[in-house]
Amino acid sequence: NLHEEINNFSIIAGVVARQQEFDIIHAHDWLTYPAGVHAKMVSGKPLCIHVHATDFDRSRGKVNPTVYSIEKNGMDHADCIMCVSELTRRTVINEYHQDPRKVFAMHNAVYPLSQELLDIPRPDHSKEKVVTFLGRITMQKGPEYFVEAAALVLRRTRNIRFVMAGSGDM
């Protein structure tokens, strides 16, 4: 039972928070928010949560009330909320009623390309535009919208190349 395991993890986090010295609590997404909240209550330390996606993103609007409640409780107790995009930040502010002053967009980063990769000759796309979808190919990222948009655009013009790169369960 997933919710039982979330609760068990929260209990363990409380025990660890009583025994260890630390400065801040960092929790990633709803599965760890109860543990983060428990650790904050036990230790009095600030809680910073990282929102990779909300249930609004994962469920396409068919939000699970239990998951929403866990997410909202974590956000309500958080001193700082880091979101992976501005879209997620707006969802947190608008759908979870969070104070914008504590919600920040912290984009996932990539390593700069090595010189060897930078030196590879690039194809000449001066006569066409290139539109990319780079990321996990999963339902929550919406790759089907990219494909649908490509079909609509290609009905009107032909000088556009659509490129998808990534991996996932779709």
Predicted features, each with a name:
Residues 2-5, 15-32:
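Short N-terminal targeting/anchoring amphipathic segment
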Residues 5-12, 45-48, 56-73, 112, ...:
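Nucleotide-sugar donor phosphate/pyrophosphate-binding loop at the beta->alpha transition
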Residues 14-19, 41, 64-81:
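Membrane-proximal helix-turn-helix segments that form the acceptor-binding/catalytic region
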Residues 24-26, 33, 37-57:
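Active-site proximal beta-strand in glycosyltransferases
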Residues 25-26, 76-86:
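A short beta-strand/loop micro-motif in the catalytic core of glycosyltransferases
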Residues 87, 109:
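Carbohydrate-associated surface elements
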Residues 123-151, 163:
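Conserved donor-binding/catalytic core segment of Leloir-type glycosyltransferases
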Residues 156-157, 161-170:
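Short, structured helix-loop element that forms part of the nucleotide-activated donor/catalytic region
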